Amino acid sequence: MNNSEDPFQQVVKDTKEQLNRINNYITRHNTAGDDDQEEEIQDILKDVEETIVDLDRSIIVMKRDENEDVSGREAQVKNIKQQLDALKLRFDRRIQESTQTTIPLEETVENSTLNTSMAENNDGGMSNPFQEQMLREQDVHLDGIHKTMQNLHIQAQTMGDELENQGQLLDNMDEGMDGVVNKLARGRRQLEWVYEKNKEKYDDCCIGLLIVVLIVLLVLAFIA
């Protein structure tokens, strides 16, 4: 199966893209933004954590197949976990640095209003549309991850059903072999019974044939 067709690889790819987006956002914004943006980032990080749990579960299912090599998949999930831990550390540090900065309330409101006005004048009002576009793209990626995880769940269920069917097939084969062995044993006992029943009669026939042969030989000897 190609990576483009593998649901596992698709989830890994989407998850890495989400982490890269958050990393780029944190890199561009050294300080914490408004509450909505920070909450959105926290939600994405939680979604990534849940995705990692689902990936670990899918690896456990794949390990049941002895022919499946999951070492590469385990390395990919480990790399994602490391990226997530690093981003969470950077995110928490930004929050702490933001809360430690004490600015009078009036000055904060005044500066915020001034900065907002300047940003609107310099950027031509593109800040909010850019944020909305980023959020829409994140929603699309999350929907893709959700659908891919559903496919992984369906595949895991299918593999479980196949293993269960194979177990039932082996049980049926064992029962069939037991039936064949029992039939062979009954046939052997019947043959032994027939042999014992007719053994004396067969012995008498053999003795009679030997007597006839001896008489014929004696007659031929006298004639000669």
Swiss-Prot record:
Locations listed in the record: Golgi apparatus, trans-Golgi network membrane; Early endosome membrane; Late endosome membrane
- State whether keyword Transmembrane helix applies: yes
Molecular function terms in GO for this entry? SNAP receptor activity; SNARE binding
An example GO CC term for this entry is:
Golgi membrane
- PTM: Phosphorylated at Thr-31 by TPK1 and dephosphorylated by SIT4. Palmitoylated by SWF1, which prevents its recognition and ubiquitination by TUL1 and its subsequent degradation.
Q: Where is the signal peptide?
A: none
GO BP annotations listed: endocytosis; Golgi to endosome transport; Golgi vesicle fusion to target membrane; intracellular protein transport; retrograde transport, endosome to Golgi; vesicle docking; vesicle fusion; vesicle fusion with Golgi apparatus
Q: Where is the lipid attached (S-palmitoyl cysteine)?
A: 205-206
Coiled coil stretches, renumbered: 35-101
Q: Which domain of life is it from?
A: Eukaryota
SMART domains attached to this UniProt entry? t_SNARE
Give the multimer and partner information.
Interacts in a SNARE-pin with the SNAREs TLG2 (Qa), VTI1 (Qb), and SNC1 or SNC2 (R). Interacts with VPS51 of the VFT (or GARP) complex.
Q: What does this protein do?
A: SNARE protein (of Qc type) involved in membrane fusion probably in retrograde traffic of cytosolic double-membrane vesicles derived from both, early and possibly late endosomes/PVC (prevacuolar compartment) back to the trans-Golgi network (TGN or late Golgi). It has been reported to function both as a (target membrane) t-SNARE and as a (vesicle) v-SNARE. Upon vesicle tethering to the target membrane, which requires additional proteins, a SNARE-pin is formed.
State the protein's name. t-SNARE affecting a late Golgi compartment protein 1
Ranked from the top, the taxonomy reads: Eukaryota, Fungi, Dikarya, Ascomycota, Saccharomycotina
